[in-house]
């Protein structure tokens, strides 16, 4: 019913030692669906490799996100946004079209700096992070200007987080096997910030931590 399609749990040479850190498994609540019918995909993420929360290190710079998509029998790809859980600060754990990091204007002597894109990932993807806030309550990547912290939605050691994705099957979905792919990605530095600061490309390399494939059958 499902399979790990990328699993680096035994790869000791993987870059940044993050590949395989988190185990993934995904499954649908039903296996056969018709167009217009909703299917709920659950994804479990288990931190089996670290004795600390993931991501760790300079967590104000790091971003880890879960991307889920469905591909029908004709190859049409559909993006599945995560279901909200309703906890305080959740908005900052879901990919959005939003600006942040306005305090980068301080060292640049740009008092009206509007900021850059906060996430640089598909809108609706689940993010595992702990945001840092400047004295004005805006997200910051500058530790020296940090006044407070937001919700810590990182994955703790031996912790399992479960995310759900409710997906109404499109009316025009092609009948046959629909593949559901869950991918957990990691970046040391968010793409918009890396581009603004003109850092080397490898600093913003997207590393696939793990990936899991399952499927449903779309009936005619």
Where are these regions (language model features)?
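Short beta-strand elements
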Residues: 193-220
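Single conserved hydrophobic/aromatic residue that forms the stacking wall/gate
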Residues: 1-8, 12
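Short amphipathic, basic-aromatic surface patches that mediate peripheral association
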Residues: 45-58
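Short, surface-exposed loop/turn segments at beta-strand-coil junctions that are enriched for proline
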Residues: 168-174
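Short acidic/polar inter-strand loop motif in beta-rich domains
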Residues: 50, 185-195
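Extended, solvent-exposed segments with strong compositional bias
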Residues: 91-163
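Solvent-exposed, conformationally flexible loop/turn segments
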Residues: 35-38, 158-160
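Internal, hydrophobic beta-strand segments that form the core of beta-sheet-rich folds
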Residues: 64, 177-189
